[in-house]
Amino acid sequence: SFPTRRSSDLELLLGQRPPRFDSSFDEAIALTGDDFERVALKAESARDYFLLVGPPGTGKTSRALRRMVEHFYAASSMQILLLAYTNRAVDEICQSLSSITPCIDYIRVGSELSCDVRFRGHLLENILAECNSRREVNIRMADCRVYVGTVASIAAKAELFKLKRFDVAIVDEATQILEPQLLGILCAKFADERNAVGKFILIGDHKQLPAVILQNSGHSEVHDEGLREAGLFNLKDSLFERLYRFHLKEESPKAIDMLCRQGRMHPGVAFFPNKAFYAGKLEALGLPHQLEHIEAPGRFIARNSVV
């Protein structure tokens, strides 16, 4: 897939040039006190890509992805592609889309067997069955600005990129997706030979949901010096993780952000993962179940310096 990209895009994916951002968003980003508004504005300001780290219970799909879609959809001509690794996550994305008002029209690419019954009316095959001519098909597909599917489903419909060019692709569960699985989509070409995907947003958590690889790390290790210079050390790593490592070196990286307020775990339960994996950045939302008194084994762990 790499050779199909322009040289500047190839340099971007290999970490040889930094991603670009629209500085006109900087003031709004600095002033907002809403975490989801902040990351949506950052995603909107990105010209190439943006990475969002979403620890457990921080609302990365139900709130952050939804807010991004609302922002992009408000721009009347924006074409949006929404991807995830599993059909269950795609169901969650569809649920988020269904909660947006006014209602957003979307088409889901995939099988009826792997789609929640609530969203089967949006399946591409069911929508096309209602069309009486190729012209109707083209009009229906052109008029819909939001497409949703698993990475595998979209990759299997390569002809979609001859009909549609997407201004942005938002990828949920991005840390579960290996680079070869994703690059075929990100490097696809539109009919006029422009990139079929203008920019991409990766949402995930490499501390929580890495890709599932059967090989051990030794067998998948990369030894080529050129690839290692590009940050590709192991074939089990996702594109998200490789790009994330690049930006960790920066003092205030524009290309990454992290949701820190979580509403799932009790502080006592969150104590260990917070310290061990998230540098103590996680904060409880203070929901009723998070305020209940429980014995906190994390205190014992802390005193004995296991962390």
Question: Predicted segments — roles?
Answer:
Residues 40, 68-69, 182-183:
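Generic hydrophobic/aromatic pocket-lining and core-packing "Φ" positions
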Residues 50-53, 81:
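Short hydrophobic/aromatic beta-strand immediately N-terminal to the Walker A/P-loop
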Residues 61-76, 92-98, 187-191:
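Walker A/P-loop NTP-binding motif
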Residues 9, 15-17, 21-26, 77-169, ...:
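Conserved P-loop NTPase motor core of helicases/translocases
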Residues 2-7:
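Short, small-residue-biased leader/transition segments that mark boundaries at the very start
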Residues 74-78, 86, 152-153, 160, ...:
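Conserved helicase motor core of SF1/SF2 NTP-dependent helicases
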Residues 30, 46, 55-58, 62, ...:
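Intrinsic disorder
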Residues 28-48, 55, 63, 149:
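N-terminal pre-P-loop "Q-motif" helix
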